[in-house]
């Protein structure tokens, strides 16, 4: 049996109550650009693949895709009309076990991005006290982490560079109106695309 042969990240799906409203919402808070809309779609194969085998013939969904400029990141918006699911998002604490916890996007203007998100009426910062702001990761030593790759682990200069990058990373978190937690980060240049 062969392992999957991945070619890239396809998308992250966000379940919403109205795709058109969600287009406008993510356009406003992320600058995301609508790419495709499949309104009130009735596709038996889609629903069967999604686990709705018995309900597939009556099922209906609206789907939208958005691109986040400056990234290879695609957001999929999905609203099930039939069968209906729970209507209120569940918001977990940052340290709760619950599957994927957040989506992180890299920015070049972290302070301005924080003020912009903070001013939005329908997002919640992960900490609502006045003390919450953009924070920088404290100085990190190479001894605080390890690489699985032996050559990287034994390269003291590369480990110091990675520790310096990590120690210069700034970030903050917020939760959108659909319950998805987002991280905006600046400086963590050694991971992601």
Regions found by a protein language model. Give the residues of each.
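Vicinal oxygen chelate
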Residues: 1-5, 14, 37, 75, ...
